[in-house]
Amino acid sequence: MEKFRNAFIEFYELSKKYLENSTGQKVYEVNYDNDIDSFLTVFPILESKIGGDINCAMSDETVILAMQQVEFKMFTFWYMRSAANVKSMLNKITDKETKEQFIRIFKDMLVYAKVITSINNMYSNMKKDTNEIVQDLKKILGIVSLIKSANNEHQAYKILMENNSFIIRTINKVLADSNYIIKIIALFNTDVVSDKIKLEEYKDVFSFSKENVIFGIKCFCDITIDGIDQINNKYVSFFKKVLPNIILFQTSCVKTTQFVNIFSKLSSIVYSEILTNERLHVLFSEIMASFKTKVSVEDLKKRKVNNIQGLISEISNNREMYKNIFVEEYEKHKTTLISIVQCITDNYNINYKENAVDIEFIFDFIQEHYISKL
């Protein structure tokens, strides 16, 4: 909102000069809050009229088209005076540099208004969306439970196929929602649902675009794993059938077979290491022992933390405590954890674009750009 306000102040200062010079009339006293609200109110109509997507890459022609739709009389400083639109003022500017500056200012206003409108819409739908995520998560955990209780791969494959439509629909929904990560965070941090400023901060950090996802998929496909044979089982067969139905895979020009092969190898490595890696077992035991000194298991039982909704509620109600525990344990065991993961990466000859993977760099990047923002 602050960026939008600053852009509007620039717009007002430049407009004031040209309106007064061209009409000989003094502008009224400006009320920035009212004018900003007025602009945001008409923005959805304005967006529909210009027919183009409002973003940083839009052309000057699109910005000028938007100027034609905005009349000065809607603002307090020129309220109900002449019906001059913003483009008419642009036409009065003879200096090329000033004209380009005015177009840039109005473009910034449009882009920031788009962001604010998006945040307001997300804010309005947040509770409904988070409830839907919980229901999806319960369904996924139910499917996982059925697979774990299956006697063999054929039974597990049958369970997956029976839930094929739900899995495809859920993956498409997650990848199509640029704010999905924020909604996951909102499950554990209720401030996001009630605080638009916090929501705007999180949107800057955790939102993702379709282009981001496609780029991530392509980067993932640049991973090579030479230390393990190709995995061939019913689970791999299932996901080779599913991914061609995922919209972003259809538009990313990535071979789904290649993606599944890499993912199946990584999944197999993770599963195997969790079962057999002694250093991991020691690390997990130390973390759990430390956790039990900070959180009473009996108290958790009394608070009925026995399902996903109970866990979400527990973390949400005691967010600062759990955040502090996480930070403390991570700092205490960070060096050991990085060493373990780096050894696993090296043992399986996992490379990215034919170069060795630097696990410490990845951990530091995630901590600096994402975890520290929570």
Swiss-Prot record:
Pfam family, one: Pox_A6
Transmembrane stretches, start-end: none
GO CC aspect terms: virion component
Cell location: Virion
Record InterPro entries: Poxvirus_A6
Annotated keywords: Virion
Disulfide bridge map: none
Family to which this protein belongs: Belongs to the chordopoxvirinae A6 family.
Function: Plays an essential role in immature virion (IV) to mature virion (MV) transition.
Protein name according to UniProt: Protein A6 homolog
Organism in which the protein naturally occurs: Fowlpox virus (strain NVSL) (FPV)
